[in-house]
Every structure is written in structure tokens, then in C-alpha cells.
Amino acid sequence: MTTTSAFMLNVRLDNVAVVAIDVPGEKVNTLKAEFAAQVRAILKQIRENKALQGVVFISAKADNFIAGADINMIGHCQNAQEAETLARQGQQLMAEIQALPVPVIAAIHGACLGGGLEMALACHRRICTDDVKTVLGLPEVQLGLLPGSGGTQRLPRLVGVSTALDMILTGKQLRARQALRAGLVDDVVPQTILLEAAVELAKKERLAQRTLPVRERILAGPLGRALLFRLVRKKTAQKTQGNYPATERIIDVIETGLAQGSSSGYDAEARAFGELAMTPQSQALRAIFFASTEVKKDPGSDAPPGPLNSVGILGGGLMGGGIAWVTACKGGLPVRIKDINTQGINHALKYSWDLLETKVRRRHIKASERDKQLALISGSTDYRGFSHRDLVIEAVFEDLPLKQQMVAEVEQNCAAHTIFASNTSSLPIGDIAANAARPEQVIGLHFFSPVEKMPLVEVIPHASTSAQTIATTVKLAKKQGKTPIVVSDKAGFYVNRILAPYINEAIRMLTEGERVEHIDAALVKFGFPVGPIQLLDEVGIDTGTKIIPVLEAAYGERFSAPANVVASILNDDRKGRKNGRGFYLYGEKGRKSKKQVDPAIYKLIGVQGQSRLSAQQVADRCVMLMLNEAARCFDEKVIRSARDGDIGAVFGIGFPPFLGGPFRYMDALGPGEMVATLQRLAALYGPRYAPCEQLVRMAERREHFWTNGETDQGN
């Protein structure tokens, strides 16, 4: 056997070369620049061995093929030319793999993403396992980049241009059966026979060429291609609002390769990669990637976590059902639900059943796996089955005496070490723990709705919460697939506190006569996934406005909302999407219909509904209040770092990722510009815009939230 660090070459007795990929000291295989020489040495041996019948590339890791290229390589590039050179080196290496004179097979188990899939595309055939861990995709667009090692050219020719555009523009990942249907892989097999199946495929002298479906062949022609690219450009522009330059470059590069040939396509790909790597959007998106990776590694405290073998949940409603699903089906932990009636328990069980059944229907999991996961969830109307639970999450109504009662009942019916975690969105954790016998085991664990989709949770210790309780709760959040940030026990915590003034200002502009759709469109153009008015409809107007009095009582007038407007809307039985009428009107459930602004809303709040402000003015009024409040949270140590503040805003409320989060955005603007803009807005609209002391100090000292040592790399 010849060993070259991350790549090991073994020639079998049947003259098939097996190249095992195993990056030393890492759980996950990633491609690094220094591996190029190692791979070339192996390729040289393969070319020189005339007896070889074929080659198989396979991972020696337990659950991943290659998860992508090491993103730090891009951060080390000083300019676009260096990044372009990096891409050309990758292209050349993949070309050498493709040019091998014998069949080359990629045997894929686990994640095959980014540079990993580009390497698999350079192989002559691909075969993968039917395991749930096996996913294939090109997610570079999520980092503001495009695939730089030939992916934009090989994928369209393999699966067709429309499928390739969809995969590369969205970064979506295909499961094994989806990849087979798309033509991305040639076979799907059990993991136990992956190597042997790949070897047998490698020994075939002539590999049949795959024919693209008729639709893809039509779209590959000049007329079909022109129509497709025109439609894709229009749809992409609507979706990105021009905020993500990578999407436009992806379309250009793929079109160039199809219209002018592969050579021109590879050249365009490398140049685009180099230029995109230097854009502020890519730098911000990479910063978010590194920050989220760091947060996922952060234990929350220095203490070791306590036992975490089973979980209890109080309340089987919308939040309780969602929490049960992520705990059992993502975390693999047994869950016991308690509700005051069987309907609540049945609701929670049906919640998980519906989500799992959707996965079965889409062939993401088998029915047996659905049943296995559902068996982890049980329920009762009393505390039977709770005595051994390590952590209990309450998801009951926002009522302080009720939550205090829950604490007392858990302490009476559960083990001495059981942690009580409250899913409150507004009540102080210290107040919930006020009468507790073991206050050190009481903590906040704030999920966002819908629980199965929203990636963030806030972990909220109060003054007496122990370090071990924090560590155990953070560990649970990670098992649930969440990104946890630890925040202080102050009114609104972090996410709701910075969101409230943003939504309040949108409502205030409505009272001034601005139109609903104009306000929402302005913030979507700025980069939010939905506008503030639509967000309020989605959350529920009753739910979303409930926290405003709490924040106003804690922080004063800057959190006041036009109370008469909110009252008028709620008194008219407008709750948003959940009851079909809010600021927007919604069609009947189960019937597809486009939401429309209800014109009656203007009469209800006593205005004409005629927009006078520009989109930029609307965005400034909402966003600047959010940024100012985020700076206050930093100053008051509500968040532990700018990193946590950026992650909380991006993952919790959809703050534009291409801006890197509120703190990176404020650093990009500069504290002096922030203070000047806030002062200008304060002169126009009142003292709620007065810049906070933190920003004024930073402007005087020319400081930034992110220190110079905190770059967009993982350090």
C-alpha cells in the first residue's frame, strides 16, 4: 500500500485501484490546497499501471464522502486573481481525474457537497448508498460563490440545464433516490455493498452513455435555452432583489459554457469565482458560516453537562408539538408529553405524524423509520412517566402564576436533578423561578415558530441558574438540530427585543398613510425574507403584539406602538394568517390563492393608504431602530458577543445574511455613519432614534464590534 496522507491507494488483486479518502485528525473530509500534490502523485501511479481495470474513489470516514472544500483557502486569498488561480488549480485537478484511461467511479456514502461533488462529477460514474446521511449538492451560492472546480460545466451536461440551474442557484441537496432520478448517480445500493458494487462497475469495459430526458434535450437547444435562461433570470432577480451577485454570475457562466463550449465555460467559471470571492456579500456570508460553526461548538458554559437521556414536555399545542418532534425525531431522545386533556396529546402526536408522513411520501425515510421515531413520543394527562426525565420543557400559556405552578409540580414529580426549561417569549426567567426549591435548575429555552423550521433557540439563564444547567440545555438544543445562543434574562431577551421596534415603526408608518405592500416591499428589497407587516401576520397579530407592553414597561417610550391601531385591528378579529384575515386576506385552507392586502385595513386605522416615502426611507426607519437596539443589547451584555448577536438576528428573524448580521453591518457602515444617520432620523421623527451610548462611544473612539483579530475565517 502507498500512503499519501489524506489519500491512500490500494490496488486489489482484481486490478481495481481503490483510493480511500481520510483527512487525518478530522471528523469530516474537506479538500485543501495542499492535497493537490497528494492526488497528483496517486493519479501518476494509476496512469503508469497499465494492468489496472478501473479506479474507485471512496471515503474512509464513517458518515461522509467529502463535505466540500476548506473555505479558509478563500480567506487566505488577497485578491481576485489569487482566488481565480485557486479555482483554476481545482479545475485542472478534476480534469486529470476525468482524463484517466480507465473507468473511474465515485463510491459515495454520506455528505458529498461542494468540491466533493465536483470531484465526483469528474469521475466517469457515481454510485451512492441509500442511507439518510447521503446527500449530494453544490451549496457554494450560500457563501456568495459558485462552484469553482468545474461544477457549473459538468453538472448541466450530466443532469440537464434546468435541473443543474435549480441545484446550483439554490444550493439544494438531493437525497440518494432523488439523485438517481435526476441522473446524478448511476445506482443506489446498501452501504454494506457500496465498495463491491463500485468495483464491479469499474470493471465494465464500456460504460453506457446516459441520455438526457426529452425536456432537457429541448432546453439544451438554442431556442429552448434562450427561453429558459430568460425565465430563470427574471425569477432569480425577483427572489434575490439584486442582493446576491453570485446568482447572476452562475446563470452567466452556465450559459457561456453551453453556448460557447466547455473551454469558455471553465474560463468564465474561474474568473467569476475569483471576483465573487472578493465581494462584500461573499465575505459576509462566509463570516456567518464560520460564526454558526463556532456557535455549534460552544458548550455554553465551562461546566460539564448533566445527564440527558429523556425529556418531558408540558403542553401539546403548536409549540409543544414542534418541540416534541425536534427532540424525538432529530435528537433521538424519548419524549413524554403532559397536557390537561387527551386532545392536546393527540395534537402533539399528530404534529409529528404529519411531518414524518410527509418525509415518507417524499421517500426521504421509510415507513419503518417513521414508526421507530414516532414510538419515542408518548403522553399522559398526569405526571406518570416523568419521574426519571432529565429535562422538562414547559410550553404552556404566557401566564406567570401558571408557569410557577409548573415549576412546583415538576419539582414534586420529577427527579432531584431534573432541569425545568421554560419556552416563554416574554416573562422573566427569574420570576418563573422565584418560588422554586431548586432555582439553579430553572432556565429559559425560547424556541421560534414553526419549531421544526426555525434554526435558532435562545438559552436564558437567570441570576441563580447553574453552569451545569446551562451546559445541559445547550447540549439538548444542539441534539435538536438547533443553533443556540445564550442570552441574559432581560425583558424581550435578544431577538424579540430588536424585532419589536422594527415592527412598531412599520405600524407607525401605516398610521402616517404608507401602504402595507409598499412597506413590506421596501424591507424585502433591503434583504429580509418577508416584510414586517407580513411577518406580523405570519406570527399572529395577537401573539406578535403581546410583548409590546412588557418591553414598554421595561424600557420606556421607545417601545410604544400606536396602541389604538393595534387595538382596532385585534377588535376586528384580525389575527393574521391563522384566521385568514389580518393586514392581508388569505384564501381558504387547502386552496392555493395569492394573499392580497385587505383594502379595509386603511379605513379601520383611519388613513388613505397613499405612499409618500421612498423604499430606502422606509427601510432606514425600520432597520436603524433594530440596529440601535442591537447595540444597546451588546452594551448591556444581553448577548455575549457580536458573533451571537449576528447569528441571533440572521437565524432568528431573517436579518439579511449577505450583510453578515447587524453587528457586521454596523461595522461596515461605521459607527460615525450610524450615529449621524440616527441623529438625522431623530430630528425628523423623534427621540426614539437617539443613538445609544454604545454607538456614540464607539464613534468617538473609532471602534468596531468585531475586533481586527476576528476575520471571516474560522479563528
UniProtKB/Swiss-Prot annotation:
Q: What is its EC number?
A: 4.2.1.17, 5.1.2.3, 1.1.1.35
Q: Does the keyword rRNA-binding apply?
A: no
What UniProt keywords are attached to this protein's entry? Cytoplasm, Fatty acid metabolism, Isomerase, Lipid degradation, Lipid metabolism, Lyase, Multifunctional enzyme, NAD, Oxidoreductase
Keyword Ion transport among record annotations: no
Classification via InterPro entries: 3-OHacyl-CoA_DH_CS (IPR006180), 3-OHacyl-CoA_DH_NAD-bd (IPR006176), 3HC_DH_C (IPR006108), 6-PGluconate_DH-like_C_sf (IPR008927), ClpP/crotonase-like_dom_sf (IPR029045), Enoyl-CoA_hydra/iso (IPR001753), FA_oxidation_alpha_subunit (IPR050136), FadJ (IPR012802)
Q: Which GO terms describe its cellular component?
A: cytoplasm
What is an example of a GO molecular function annotated in this UniProt entry? Answer: 3-hydroxybutyryl-CoA epimerase activity
Swiss-Prot/TrEMBL GO biological process terms: fatty acid beta-oxidation
Region (Enoyl-CoA hydratase) residue spans: 1-190
Question: Which pathway does the record list?
Answer: Lipid metabolism; fatty acid beta-oxidation
Site feature Important for catalytic activity, where: E118, E140
Family per record: In the N-terminal section; belongs to the enoyl-CoA hydratase/isomerase family.
Report the function annotation for this chain.
Catalyzes the formation of a hydroxyacyl-CoA by addition of water on enoyl-CoA. Also exhibits 3-hydroxyacyl-CoA epimerase and 3-hydroxyacyl-CoA dehydrogenase activities.
Listed name of the protein: Fatty acid oxidation complex subunit alpha
Tell me the organism.
Salmonella schwarzengrund (strain CVM19633)
